């Protein structure tokens, strides 16, 4: 009777209360979301690296091409031959270029001697202003003619066939404006290239 009285009384679900309840971790509940986010980030990084490298290659190629053109902007236009007009021929060693393209390195003996009046020459105009009279002009013209004749006598003889050359009177202002235009064009191209990066 005492044993019945002192028998322990267990509450209901006592075993369930003693078993540890494990709460699910954050990674286990959001595992698929985290994996999808990682894959998307890796894909975005790969695409950005590819775009940056291709743009860098294009910019490097453009800079290299621009540097080559800046070193020698007329490298593909130097000795451009044109077909002679019918009935004309060129002497040996003479080169003619198409209009608008520069010809560099021409020998001085290939330049034709023109008989323009002395007043059209800026050098003799300065001589007239310095000496003050047409007598000085005639003296300067005769000295220039004798120098041209001696240079023509010492120069190798060319065939007598006529040939056509385009002669332009180049002044210092024209040369400076051409250099300034080239400099502005190169600067603009470099700035445009830097802005495109």
Curated annotation (Swiss-Prot):
Location(s) in or outside the cell: Virion membrane; Host cytoplasm, Host cytoskeleton; Host endoplasmic reticulum membrane
Induction notes from the record:
Expressed in the late phase of the viral replicative cycle.
Alphabetical keyword list: Apoptosis, Cytoplasmic inwards viral transport, Host cytoplasm, Host cytoskeleton, Host endoplasmic reticulum, Host membrane, Host-virus interaction, Late protein, Membrane, Microtubular inwards viral transport, Repeat, Transmembrane, Transmembrane helix, Viral envelope protein, Virion, Virus entry into host cell
An example Gene Ontology biological process? symbiont entry into host cell
- Residue ranges of region 4 X 4 AA tandem repeats of A-A-A-S? 139-154
Can the keyword tRNA processing be found in this entry's annotation?
Answer: no
Domain of life, per the record? Viruses
Please report any disulfide bonds recorded for this protein chain, giving both cysteine positions.
none
The portions of this protein that span the membrane are 32-52
**Where in this protein does the record put region Disordered?**
84-123
The cellular component terms of Gene Ontology attached to this UniProt record, alphabetical and capped at eight, are:
host cell; host cell endoplasmic reticulum membrane; host cytoskeleton; membrane; viral envelope; virion membrane
sequence repeat segments: 139-142, 143-146, 147-150, 151-154
Give me the ranges of the annotated region Interaction with host DYNLL1. 163-175
How does the entry describe its membrane topology? Single-pass membrane protein
The UniProt entry lists the main location of this chain as: virion
Tell me, in a sentence or two, what this protein's role is.
Inner envelope protein involved, through its interaction with host dynein, in the intracellular microtubule-dependent transport of viral capsid toward viral factories. Seems to induce caspase-3 activation and apoptosis. Plays a role in virion morphogenesis by recruiting and transforming the host ER membranes into the precursors of the viral envelope. Involved in virus attachment to the host cell.
Q: How does it assemble?
A: Interacts with the host light chain cytoplasmic dynein DYNLL1; this interaction is critical for intracellular microtubule-dependent virus transport toward viral factories.
Query: What is stated as this protein's family in its record?
Result: Belongs to the asfivirus envelope protein p54 family.
Protein name, per record: Inner membrane protein p54
């Amino acid at each position: 009777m005492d044993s019945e009285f002192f028998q322990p009384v267990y509450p209901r679900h006592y075993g369930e209360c003693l078993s540890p309840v494990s709460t699910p971790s954050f990674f286990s509940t959001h595992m698929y979301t985290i994996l999808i986010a990682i894959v998307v980030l890796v894909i975005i990084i790969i695409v950005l690296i590819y775009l940056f490298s291709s743009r860098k290659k294009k910019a490097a190629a453009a800079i290299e091409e621009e540097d080559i053109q800046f070193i020698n902007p007329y490298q593909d236009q130097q000795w451009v031959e044109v077909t002679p007009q019918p009935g004309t021929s060129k002497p040996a060693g003479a080169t003619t270029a198409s209009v608008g393209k520069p010809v560099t390195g021409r020998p001085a003996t290939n330049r034709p001697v023109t008989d323009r009046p002395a007043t059209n020459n800026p050098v003799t105009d300065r001589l007239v202003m310095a000496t003050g009279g047409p007598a000085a002009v005639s003296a300067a013209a005769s000295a220039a003619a004798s120098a041209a004749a001696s240079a023509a006598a010492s120069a190798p003889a060319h065939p007598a066939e006529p040939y056509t050359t385009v002669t332009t009177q180049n002044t210092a202002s024209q040369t400076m404006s051409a250099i300034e235009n080239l400099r502005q064009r190169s600067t603009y191209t470099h700035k445009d290239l830097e802005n495109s990066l």
